[in-house]
Structure formats: structure tokens, C-alpha cells
Amino acid sequence: MSFQIPRGTQDILPEQAAKWQYIEHIARELCRRYNYQEIRTPIFEHTELFLRGVGDTTDIVQKEMYTFEDRGGRSLTLRPEGTAAVVRSFVENKMYGDPNQPVKLYYMGPMFRYERPQAGRFRQFVQFGVEALGSNDPAIDAEVIALAMDIYRMLGLKKLKLVINSLGDVESRKAHRQALIDHFQPRIHEFCDDCQARLHKNPMRILDCKKDRDHELMRTAPSILDYLNEQSRTYFEKVQMYLQKLGIAFEVDSRLVRGLDYYNHTAFEIMSEAEGFGAITTLCGGGRYNGLVQEIGGPETPGIGFALSIERLLAALEAEGISLPISEGIDCYVVALGEQAKEEAVALVAALRKEGISAEKDYQDRKVKAQLKAADRLHATYVAILGEDELQKGVINVKHMATGEQQEVSLHTFISHMKHVLQ
């Protein structure tokens, strides 16, 4: 019987893993610059966390979660997103008492959603995200957006569009909610079952419907921006002002609501405008969630964050034809001829590795020509050739693979020589 990976998953082979490692390095380095610290949470959580944290009217909760019962009869769910788990940890570990507010965290790891696999979309996917908890300053909204944009820019992406919106505070959303109900109610029967169910539970989510997005009532739906009270409007204006100060271009789209129930005030998405990227252009999404900490059992605490898919990021890089500057080769391949030379090669390779030099040798008992081909396939910068004659003379031949330049080096100084030429 032959086995294949489950639908919606992928194997990340070594040549691809190098790209992932580079992206992860860039993300971590930017988090260091922005003073965000890493947090790691379990891959599965109690199902109730996502029902309360993500929202029971969302597609994620209703259609996409991988939920199971453990042997103790507890309902557990593979995490479909990262924010709810980070906030749960923030509350459980009483991080709201940290004197260094806001608490700035980032996470990276696999998420799971049962959705239709397509280009750049998988049922197991890796998210990178940040959360800033404890500040109501619109400047941190702009900082979070700037961090997301910086990740894409450092990787070379240029064809990007930032879209922002305000979902307002509780008072603003209440007024807008009633306006949406009044707008859609007379013809709600023309909409899909999901929209009909959302009309009185969370009518703003109707605006996020993919099936009915071209319906004429969608185009004429009341704009949240017309229902913002003075406090919400002022907050949104300050976010825009800070983005302008940072030199970040953006568009305001009053129909942007995001797919999770916990957002309020600022909501944003970063999209790819690269040709041939596909119908789903969103690379990153985020926003403010001032009520989520309280919903999960903590004190009233403001928060804002974003999440991006590494798979979508890789697809965007491919669409723009961007190659990442990753090192594909090893520093030195030691070619050994004869039994005594093979024994010496083991020690030489170990000594190189101890000095931080990537090194390899033959383990297949291949001839010299085959060993040289192996070194070439590994993109070795140097090849060090050691035979019986070299052993008797106490030397080793070092060849630069790109230029063909060859040099005889004393075995006693070989390691220091390699450190010098590889600087």
C-alpha cells in the first residue's frame, strides 16, 4: 500500500524549506527591531475558546474547524487562527499585570481549517502574526500595519495595496447594525442561507459574503463610516494621520469587515496586485479587538494585531518573480582516496564543523570523479582532496569550485586556511 499526504496539506522539501527559513528569519528580525517577543501556544485548544473568541457566526467556527473529542470526552479543536490562543495565554498567565505595557507578542506556526484547497491555500497552513495588548493609542495601530508592510518590503514585494476601514466602537456599530437590518430585511430571501442566518445575529458579516457580493443591495448598503460617532471618527482619522507620517499609502474601503467577529475600530488588509496572482488577493489581515480579552475572561484590555500566511507570501513572491537570497551550498566537501585518507577525512570534516564551516564527505565509497560530482551537486564552494600521496607529504589540495584555482595546504594549517578563505 502506498501512502499520500492528506488533501490540503504539503511536504516542504529541503530546497523549499530554505525559503521558509529565510522568511522566518526576516519576520523574527523585524519583530526584534519593533520589540515584539515570541509566544508559543498549543496546537489544540478547548473548542469553547474559538466559539467565544472567533465568533459562532463566522465561517471558521461553523464550517472550517477540525474538532474532536479526546478520551476524556473533552471537545478540543486544532487552532484555526492564532489570536484567540494568544489572548487566552495573556489572560491565563496574567500578562495584563506586566508593567511594560503594551505587551507586544508574535507567533509563528501551523493553523488548520477545513476549506477548499486552492493556489496558496491549504488546510494546514503556517501563520505569522503579532498582537499588541494594552494600548488604545492609534499610533500602535499604525505601528502594527507598518510592521506587516515592512515584512513584505524587506522580501522585495512591490505590488501591494493596503486597505483600511473603521468598524467603530460599540455605539457606532449598534447604529450601523440597525441600518443594515433595515436595508437587507425586505429582500433577505434573495441571499444565501448564511446571510439570512446572519441578518439578526451579525448583519455586518453579510458584507463579507463571497456568494452574494455582487448583489445590488451590497453596493448600496449603508457605510459604517456614516455611523461613526465623534470618538470613533477621531480615532480613525488619527490612524490615517500616523500612516501618512510613516509614508504608508492606503485606501479606505467601508465594506472591509474581516471574517472574524472580534474586530472593532481599525480593520485592514494587505493585498497583492501582481498579475496572475489569482482571485483571492489578500496576503495579510488584521485589526483592533478591544473586547476580546474581556470575552475570554480577562480585564478590559485593548488589543490590535495581524496575521499573514507564509504560503500566500511565497505565492506572491513567485507572482512577482522574486528570488530570495538564500545560500544553497556548503562551504567545503572533503574528497578522500584510500582507507587511511578516509579515516583522516572524518576528523577533518568534524574539525571544520566545530569552526562553524559547513562540511561534507563521501559515505558511499565512491570513486574520485563521483565524489567531485557529488560536491558539485551540493554547490560546494571548495573541495579539499586528500589521497595517500598527500597524507605522506602532510598536505591537502584545496580547490575553489567556481574558479578552478587549486592550492596545496599543510594539513596542520588546513582548518585555519579554510576559515580565512571563507571570511
From Swiss-Prot:
Q: Where does it live in the cell? A: Cytoplasm
Enzyme Commission number(s) from the entry: 6.1.1.21
State where it is primarily located: cytoplasm
* Coiled coil ranges: none
GO cellular component terms, A-Z: cytoplasm
Q: Which domain of life is it from?
A: Bacteria
**Entry's Gene3D superfamilies?**
Anticodon-binding domain (3.40.50.800), Bira Bifunctional Protein, Domain 2 (3.30.930.10)
Is Ligase a UniProt keyword of this protein?
yes
Picking any one GO biological process from the record gives: histidyl-tRNA aminoacylation
Q: Does the record carry Hydrolase as a key word?
A: no
Complexes and interactors: Homodimer.
Q: Which family does it belong to?
A: Belongs to the class-II aminoacyl-tRNA synthetase family.
Q: Give the protein's recorded name.
A: Histidine--tRNA ligase
Species in which this protein is naturally found: Anoxybacillus flavithermus (strain DSM 21510 / WK1)
